A protein has these predicted regions:
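Phosphate-group recognition and catalysis centered on beta-loop-alpha active-site segments
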Residues: 1-250
């Protein structure tokens, strides 16, 4: 086990490039990599006909030119949508990527990836076999993946289907009963919003051999506080937070 005091800080960029490109798109991954991002957080769903794809929201309206529930559509419809609709820096239409497209890119990219499983228990029956197959077909990409979910069912099932992969449980507050449950599931990390991590809670997580992951890190001051209390994985929407932190420490 790596001692918490010596483990390097991990900066995980949400959506691939934060606010610099349409989230969960190939454009975001390419932009993030070009800016030196080495760890990203993307969101995984499954289409009505069983194709895993990258998309965050349940509904399509916020980021596409369509309306409706994303996972209720077949892949032939989803892949035609513009996933950059309304984004302030989008240079042109961006398609919703299939998981296989992302993993094919990841095979040669020097970057790690957390995939958040955004699926109901019923949808897991479609998603997990397709996910496992894609990982088997592209092992160089698979070794760079870990998985997260706020669903205990999804976390447990991922452990059964994708053996040996890192897993993270998303929680509201990292209280001891939750930490114990996470440890019993065999996950390596628990994640919650930045405001819910205190030094005591980080210490409690370590007692259960769990890494603390913080979401909604809004600025450099947030980052400094979290690092001071012992959080080693920070999830950010703004890549410049890391740059400002690095500058302040040099």
């Amino acid at each position: 086990m790596i001692r918490a005091e010596t483990k390097p800080i991990e900066w995980v960029v949400m959506g691939g490039a934060g606010k610099l490109a349409p989230e969960n798109t190939m454009a975001a991954l390419i932009e993030g990599l070009a800016r030196g991002v080495d760890h990203v957080w993307l969101d995984l769903q499954v289409s009505k006909d069983g194709v895993p794809f990258l998309f965050r929201d349940k509904r399509l309206e916020r980021t596409t030119n369509a309306r409706g529930i994303a996972h209720s559509l077949d892949w032939k419809h989803l892949k035609q949508l513009d996933a950059s609709d309304g984004h302030h820096v989008a240079a042109g239409p961006e398609r919703i990527p299939a998981l296989t497209e992302v993993l094919d890119w990841l095979q040669s990219a020097d970057i790690r990836m957390i995939l958040e499983i955004r699926a109901t228990d019923r949808m897991l029956a479609r998603l997990l076999p397709a996910l496992a197959k894609a990982c088997q077909q592209m092992p160089r990409a698979s070794e760079k993946l870990s998985f997260a979910s706020g669903s205990t069912t999804a976390v447990v099932r991922c452990g059964e289907v994708l053996r040996g992969k890192g897993r993270l449980l998303i929680v509201d507050k990292p209280k001891r009963p939750i930490l114990l449950a996470a440890q019993e599931m065999g996950v390596g990390s628990v994640g919650c919003t930045a405001m819910n991590w205190t030094e005591k809670r980080v210490r409690n997580a370590r007692e259960y051999d769990l890494e603390a992951t913080a979401f909604a890190v809004r600025n450099c001051n947030d980052a400094k506080r979290l690092i001071k209390v012992g959080v080693k994985r920070l999830c950010i929407d703004d890549i410049d937070i890391k740059h400002r932190y690095d500058s302040s420490m040099s």
